[in-house]
């Protein structure tokens, strides 16, 4: 983490501004004097203010954080003044007269950054023009001067430090915001130094027990680990010196959050982690990086599955480094990162590196890297002009800032950065609108893949096109999974808007009629509310907009429900569930044969389905001979069976499903979704269409996260039916995950 300096505290325990400024490492005397004047101005403006101490110290913290990034003097002055401006102690107009336009513009840009919260707050709601304008201003401020973003990140770190001793709910609130918003933003901009501190503080507040456990493990083995790394580094230095490779070699600290995340992701214990012992090699030149890699792999056996060359294939945020894991002395794993000095600075500072090298001979290279990092933002500003739906614009910003990324290759080897979960059509529309419109197929590594294929990291994709554009309206259906990005959907919407207006009107009428019939509302009644709501003069304009995809159907339906006092979501769900449970479905060719399980070697011994895992036909099964209750039939992957096997392996018997049995089996399916009106109705409609009996439903809502969790006990006849049902449930709008519970 970034350490808080104490050099500015004198012997009497008082703040000494001269010592403080000297501790910041500012080389220009003029800049030091300028910062001293700004500090004096802050003292003057906060005199008598009840929160003077808090505001001043927050500014000091922000300046210290930013000084580790070697930010320029205007950035440091803006950081020192920002807490005062944000608390309305002094207005921007007054500041402009006192400290100048350039510093105030930075402060104004930092205040515009508050709009980033609306990207999370409005994810499932309708959006106002004011919210969209706020986000547009934020994007423009970020592109115009990226220092405002870095200042905002420093302000959030300062806040996390402040709440260390605050009540738990205050710490958790601050940590959740930074986890959801600011840490992903720091990562997207490549500012590793700030990203790690944000993540470690958030992890400490949100998971205090896990944080303390890992911190304790690191501390307990610190001396042994440091001694091991010292010897390992000494050997590498000697070998590279002998080969004439110029590079620094040193052990590097591990961040607690990254350790925990890897333990969770790979289901590893602390002792099984590769990178608790970590070394970094920082070389002078690129060729020295690969020479160093050769030396490492010559003297130590490497693990091929843990090798990544991010120099040849940089991460979407511009990160470059070679990662390898080797078996060191004693068979202990050591993770090694190899990079040039420029790559190291870029990895730690990200966009902030541009300001460090803005002046002088290095400016050109730094500027190029800076431009690469904000290219996605410039595209966002250009794309927003094409997006008629303001909600789509916000969706695209959310995707670019918060979503995980995947990078793939064109046939020529160019890297394309897309949101994780993107499809071949998303790729095609990213390349060019015309490529997407004319797309009829795609190949990954020379193999044809379906349009619903989710692109994987490193895929090389080729788009197959026809002469004439012919996109399908089905591509806009979110349940089918053809197009997942707002960028792609916007391009398709635009194409249909330009086509025959009559076709859009007919399609819109069909869509609207279906929804109105379901709601029990006539078209004339709906017109009176919809025309003014969407600023249309006649119904044909409205229908054309619906058919062309310009109006979001779920928002329109929610609006009509509120206008006509239709049943609440709870009432609709209860009615749908009651109607479904009144029906009982059975397979048409149900067998009367009760030989549901064949257990090898035990004849017709009584058997029953184990409640712990509730296997169904299609699951691989195993029998366990109980005492007095015959044979219990378990799924082969049942955790309880594994326990039984370890204690009494002689009681385990092979079992298979009988060919003629078709009775129903009960199990529990859990659906997690964004809470919305009509969610349970949509889910139960699918179950009814699939003729699945619902035996019970339990649901709960998380109002803070706006999530609904629904556990349904259903009767299923085989694994194929279950797979089909889960597939359709996962395609319901707003459903995040639908799966069979492990114990069912």
Curated annotation (Swiss-Prot):
Enzyme Commission code: 2.7.6.5
Catalytic activity from the UniProt record: GTP + ATP = guanosine 3'-diphosphate 5'-triphosphate + AMP
Domain TGS: 404-465
Pathway: Purine metabolism; ppGpp biosynthesis; ppGpp from GTP: step 1/2
Limits of the HD domain: 55-160
Keywords, sorted A to Z: ATP-binding, GTP-binding, Kinase, Nucleotide-binding, Transferase
Disruption phenotype: A slight increase in biofilm formation in a csrA-disrupted background; when combined with a spoT disruption (a ppGpp0 mutant) there is a very large increase in biofilm formation. The ppGpp0 mutant makes decreased levels of CsrA and its inhibitory small RNAs (sRNA) CsrB and CsrC. Deletion of relA alone decreases persister cell formation in a hipA7 mutant; the double relA/spoT deletion obviates persister cell formation.
Function: In eubacteria ppGpp (guanosine 3'-diphosphate 5'-diphosphate) is a mediator of the stringent response which coordinates a variety of cellular activities in response to changes in nutritional abundance. This enzyme catalyzes the formation of pppGpp which is then hydrolyzed to form ppGpp. The second messengers ppGpp and c-di-GMP together control biofilm formation in response to translational stress; ppGpp represses biofilm formation while c-di-GMP induces it.
Protein's recorded name: GTP pyrophosphokinase
Organism name: Escherichia coli (strain K12)
Gene name for this UniProt entry: relA
């Amino acid at each position: 983490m970034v350490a808080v300096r104490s050099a500015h505290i004198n012997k009497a325990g008082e703040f000494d501004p001269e010592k403080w400024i000297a501790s910041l490492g500012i080389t220009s005397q003029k800049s030091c004097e300028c910062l001293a004047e700004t500090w004096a101005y802050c003292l003057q403006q906060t005199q008598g203010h009840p929160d003077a101490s808090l505001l001043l110290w927050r500014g000091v913290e922000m300046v210290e954080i930013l000084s580790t990034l070697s930010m320029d003097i205007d950035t440091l002055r803006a950081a020192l003044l920002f807490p005062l401006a944000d608390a309305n102690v002094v207005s921007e107009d007054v500041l402009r007269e006192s400290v100048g336009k350039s510093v105030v513009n930075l402060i104004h840009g930092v205040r515009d950054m508050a709009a980033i919260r609306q990207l999370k707050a409005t994810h499932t709601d309708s959006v106002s023009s004011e919210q969209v304008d706020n986000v547009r201003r934020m994007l423009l401020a970020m592109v115009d001067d990226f220092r405002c973003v870095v200042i905002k990140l420093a302000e959030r770190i300062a806040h996390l430090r402040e709440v260390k001793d605050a009540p738990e709910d205050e710490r958790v609130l601050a940590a959740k915001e930074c986890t959801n918003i600011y840490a992903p933003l720091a990562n997207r901009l490549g500012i590793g130094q700030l990203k790690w501190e944000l993540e470690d503080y958030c992890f400490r507040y949100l998971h205090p027990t896990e944080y303390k456990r890992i911190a304790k493990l690191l501390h307990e083995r610190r001396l042994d680990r440091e001694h091991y790394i010292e010897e390992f580094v000494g050997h590498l230095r000697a070998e590279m010196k002998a080969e004439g490779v110029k590079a620094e070699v040193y052990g590097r600290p591990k961040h607690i959050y990254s350790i925990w995340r890897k333990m969770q992701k790979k289901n590893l214990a602390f002792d099984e982690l590769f990178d608790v012992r970590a070394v970094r090699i920082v070389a002078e030149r690129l060729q020295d990086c690969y020479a160093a890699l050769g030396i490492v792999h010559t003297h130590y056996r490497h693990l091929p599955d843990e090798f990544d060359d991010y120099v040849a294939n940089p991460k979407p945020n511009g990160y470059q480094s070679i990662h390898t894991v080797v078996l060191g002395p004693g068979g202990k794993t050591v993770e090694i990162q190899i990079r040039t000095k420029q790559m190291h600075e870029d990895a730690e500072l990200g966009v902030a590196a541009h300001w460090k090298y803005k002046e002088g001979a290095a400016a050109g290279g730094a500027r190029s890297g800076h431009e690469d990092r904000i290219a996605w933002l410039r595209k966002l500003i250009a794309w927003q002009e094409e997006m008629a739906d303001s909600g789509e614009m916000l969706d695209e910003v959310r995707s670019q800032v918060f979503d995980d990324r995947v990078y793939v290759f064109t046939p020529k080897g160019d890297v394309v950065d897309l949101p994780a979960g993107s499809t071949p059509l998303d790729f095609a529309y990213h390349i060019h609108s015309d490529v997407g419109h004319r797309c009829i197929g795609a190949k990954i590594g020379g193999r044809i893949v379906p349009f619903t294929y989710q692109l994987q990291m490193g895929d090389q994709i080729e788009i197959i096109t026809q002469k004439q554009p012919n996109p399908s309206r089905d591509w806009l259906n979110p349940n089918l999974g053809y197009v997942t990005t707002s960028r792609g959907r916007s391009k398709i919407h635009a194409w249909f808007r330009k086509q025959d207006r009559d076709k859009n009107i007919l399609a819109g009428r069909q869509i609207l009629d279906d929804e109105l019939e379901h709601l029990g509302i006539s078209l004339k009644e709906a017109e009176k509310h919809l025309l003014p709501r969407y600023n249309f003069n006649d119904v044909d304009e409205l229908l054309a907009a619906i058919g062309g995809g310009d109006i979001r159907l779920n928002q329109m339906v929610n609006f009509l429900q509120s206008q006509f006092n239709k049943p609440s979501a709870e009432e609709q769900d209860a009615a749908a569930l009651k109607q479904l449970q009144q029906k009982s479905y059975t397979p048409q060719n149900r067998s009367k044969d009760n030989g549901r399980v064949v257990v090898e070697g035990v004849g017709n011994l009584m058997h029953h389905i184990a409640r712990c895992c509730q296997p169904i036909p299609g699951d691989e099964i195993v029998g366990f001979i109980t005492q007095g209750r015959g044979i219990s039939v378990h799924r082969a992957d049942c955790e309880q069976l594994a326990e039984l096997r370890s204690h009494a392996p002689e009681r385990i018997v092979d079992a298979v499903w009988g060919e003629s049995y078709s009775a129903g089996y009960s199990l529990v399916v859990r659906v997690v979704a964004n809470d919305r009106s009509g969610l349970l109705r949509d889910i139960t409609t699918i179950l009814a269409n699939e003729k699945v009996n619902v035996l019970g439903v339990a649901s709960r809502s998380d109002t803070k996260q706006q999530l609904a969790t629904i556990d349904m006990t259903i009767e299923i006849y085989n694994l194929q039916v279950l797979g089909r049902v889960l597939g359709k449930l996962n395609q319901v709008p707003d459903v995040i995950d639908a799966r069979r519970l492990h114990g069912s």
